[in-house]
């Protein structure tokens, strides 16, 4: 059976680093075996869901190259949920309850005060039809709970955490539908996973207890549960859960000049001991993706690492990939010359300005000015189409006896206004000969 994964964000905000890592790993898991990666918009929370966030989620996935093979929206699937809900009610697996949030909180506090786990006591199961009728007459509307089977132990072999076991007697029957008829997360998610043919659910370890409950939901719905794997959560560079991580969206990275390939390269390996390899494209990352390589320790996301990977990515980008982002007039030769010195593509503009001029050179002493005047005369006589930097420096070395830094640094400073930068052998041919002579003569 082909692998089918899904990414199921709620459109209540923009994607952050943790969301994107989940989406990427589901995409890699599916593509590793030629399977399908599906997007499901979990928009049952009508009050908080926004269409602008749906569009933002789609745009971010597109930018990252994580193109879904299909899309569903929960808000368009309510008839399916209603049908399955009624089936479970009739089977006795869903029941009505009426406790208010305050009443439930009081029950929890009493249990905790007695040193007992705060498990729902199933008081609502004792209500008779007459009790329900009386509550309805009084205007009380029920919320709905899924009845866990206390005689059916919950186990699964987690793709990352290994064998997992939960005792349903130590779990509360989850509320799956509010009194206003709106849905909570767990039942619609299980219904959709069945209907969409999901074979593998890969998500954060904060969903482990949800998985325990949903496994019984799959069984109650007459379906085989998918394979589950739960990743360790991301932390910041200091090793702690970070509010900044939850706020960092793809737009922030785009503004910083981060390329999508860098995000994919770093997040693909985050949580493993495998080195980040900027040379691997998405297809190669999918081929090497292996859940067994992921550990249970929190995965650290360091923005400094991302910028380092981004520089490595930029150094490999072909001209065709970046041409539309470069300043007017900057061709392939210029990109090839400047590329190794960039951390972000937009820095190419600064170096193109060095090529086109003007530049501001430092103030030189008399001896250096005399050397540069000789360099200007030499430059004026060179064949500019035949490695002018090599010819210029060789002639000056022979004529002045200068070598090393004393030879190269004044020339670089006069020609570019910088002490460091791209290889001069690649950069100098881009500067017009008369402009180079002018700079050396200035």
Swiss-Prot record:
Motif ('HIGH' region): 9-19
Main location: cytoplasm
One family name in Pfam for this protein: Anticodon_2
Keywords: Aminoacyl-tRNA synthetase, ATP-binding, Cytoplasm, Ligase, Nucleotide-binding, Protein biosynthesis
Recorded superkingdom: Bacteria
SUPFAM superfamilies: An anticodon-binding domain of class I aminoacyl-tRNA synthetases, Nucleotidylyl transferase
Biological processes annotated in GO: glutamyl-tRNA aminoacylation
Ranges spanned by the short sequence motif 'KMSKS' region, renumbered to the chain: 240-244
Molecular function GO labels: ATP binding; glutamate-tRNA ligase activity; tRNA binding
Keyword Zinc-finger belongs to the record: no
EC id: 6.1.1.17
Places the protein is found: Cytoplasm
A cellular component term, taken from the record's GO annotations: cytoplasm
HAMAP family in the record: Glu_tRNA_synth_type1
PANTHER family: GLUTAMATE--TRNA LIGASE, GLUTAMATE--TRNA LIGASE, MITOCHONDRIAL-RELATED
Protein name: Glutamate--tRNA ligase 1
Species name: Novosphingobium aromaticivorans (strain ATCC 700278 / DSM 12444 / CCUG 56034 / CIP 105152 / NBRC 16084 / F199)
Gene: gltX1
